[in-house]
């Protein structure tokens, strides 16, 4: 049976070189080794049949010059497309884009990646620029309009908050802070009108939605009761939050999975690993826990591949032909 990993990173040479020039990841996380051989080894261990590659944060925006950032996004996308073309049953990819404040460059890269390279979707990070500019920012509306028109799958991955100071030296930001950033970005989308105005996108939130499933009822209950309201009821806000898709990357534990499956709409949970950025043994521990977690067989099938095949028609055709 097919198993599709929708949260799976790679480091093309141009991206690794850009990170080295910048002195590493601003979040404090290490830059892990990545080769195609290492990638295929972990997928065998996880029994994954198809991997959707993506460039993780900070992405092309590590280049402060907008022209260089656009060129880096193009190079990453062409590297991903080459891997996919060599093994179309085993790989797909989410396209990288430069900073969303560079609207023209982003729209140009989305057009090229989706039309020429046939990307399976687009990666966006939780915020852009020097401030707390989350994905509901008014400047990003032309990009959301374009993605909605295309019916694009949008993979939202956390990046470092404005304040890069660590809790302490034991805790680089991806370990604990990133789920908060995902929750913040999701709430910004819910309360800025983006989801209502551009409903064509299918949005995947990383790491089981971060803090969103845990905190949505807190915010949704109070928002309609404030002096300044959105005009949405508690129930409408919660239902809007349930339209997101959620991957399981480094999130498979009894507390998180219970909350996620109670909250997410049916068919909206997808398997993810976070290779190579999570430690190898942690990836296998989370993967094995998910496999052993008691779920109805149809739900297991949806998590492994069914939900992803609904999102990625290219893969559905290929895997149906292969009878996976």
Curated annotation (Swiss-Prot):
State its location(s).
Answer: Cytoplasm, Cytosol
Q: Which UniProt keywords apply?
A: Cytoplasm, Decarboxylase, Hydrolase, Lyase, Metal-binding, Zinc
> What are the EC numbers?
4.1.1.52
Concerning Gene3D superfamilies, the annotation shows:
Metal-dependent hydrolases
What does induction of this protein depend on?
Expression is correlated with the production of patulin. Expression is positively regulated by the secondary metabolism regulator laeA. Expression is strongly decreased with increased sucrose concentrations. This decrease is lost in the presence of malic acid. Expression is increased with pH changes from 2.5 to 3.5 in the presence of a limiting concentration of sucrose, 50 mM. Natural phenols present in apple fruits such as chlorogenic acid or the flavonoid epicatechin modulate patulin biosynthesis.
GO biological process, any:
patulin biosynthetic process
Identify the stretch annotated as signal peptide in this record: none
What does the UniProt function comment say about this protein? 6-methylsalicylic acid decarboxylase; part of the gene cluster that mediates the biosynthesis of patulin, an acetate-derived tetraketide mycotoxin produced by several fungal species that shows antimicrobial properties against several bacteria. PatG catalyzes the decarboxylation of 6-methylsalicylic acid to yield m-cresol. The pathway begins with the synthesis of 6-methylsalicylic acid by the polyketide synthase (PKS) patK via condensation of acetate and malonate units.
PANTHER family, from UniProt?
2-AMINO-3-CARBOXYLMUCONATE-6-SEMIALDEHYDE DECARBOXYLASE, AMIDOHYDROLASE-RELATED DOMAIN-CONTAINING PROTEIN
Name it.
Answer: 6-methylsalicylic acid decarboxylase
Cite the source lineage. Answer: Eukaryota, Fungi, Dikarya, Ascomycota, Pezizomycotina
Q: Which gene encodes it?
A: patG
């Amino acid at each position: 049976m097919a198993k599709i990993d929708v949260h799976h990173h790679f480091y093309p040479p141009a991206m690794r070189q850009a990170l080295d020039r910048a002195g590493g990841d601003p979040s404090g996380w290490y830059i892990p080794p990545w080769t195609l051989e290492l990638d295929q080894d972990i997928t065998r261990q996880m029994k994954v049949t198809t991997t959707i590659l993506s460039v993780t944060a900070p992405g092309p925006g590590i280049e402060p010059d907008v022209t260089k950032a656009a060129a880096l996004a193009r190079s990453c996308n062409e590297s991903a497309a080459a891997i996919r073309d060599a093994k179309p049953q085993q790989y797909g990819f989410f396209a990288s884009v430069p900073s969303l404040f560079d609207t023209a460059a982003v729209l140009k890269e989305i057009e090229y990646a989706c039309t020429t390279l046939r990307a399976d979707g687009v990666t966006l990070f939780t915020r852009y620029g020097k401030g707390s500019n989350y994905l509901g920012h008014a400047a990003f509306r032309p990009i959301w309009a374009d993605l909605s028109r295309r019916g694009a799958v949008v993979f939202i991955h956390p990046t470092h908050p404005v304040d890069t100071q660590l809790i302490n030296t034991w805790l680089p930001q991806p370990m604990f802070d990133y789920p908060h950033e995902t929750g913040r970005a999701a709430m910004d989308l819910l309360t800025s009108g983006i989801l209502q105005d551009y409903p064509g996108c299918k949005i995947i939130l990383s790491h089981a939605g971060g803090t969103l499933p845990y905190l949505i009822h807190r915010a949704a209950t109070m928002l309609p009761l404030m002096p300044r309201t959105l005009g949405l009821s508690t129930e409408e806000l919660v239902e809007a939050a349930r339209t997101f898709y959620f991957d399981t990357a480094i999130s498979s534990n009894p507390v998180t999975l219970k909350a996620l499956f109670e909250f997410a709409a049916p068919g909206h949970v997808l398997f993810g690993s976070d290779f190579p950025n999570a430690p190898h043994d942690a990836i296998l521990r989370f993967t094995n826990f998910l496999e052993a977690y008691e779920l109805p067989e149809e739900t297991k099938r949806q998590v492994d591949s069914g939900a992803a095949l609904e999102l990625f028609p290219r893969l559905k055709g290929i895997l149906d032909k292969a009878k996976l």
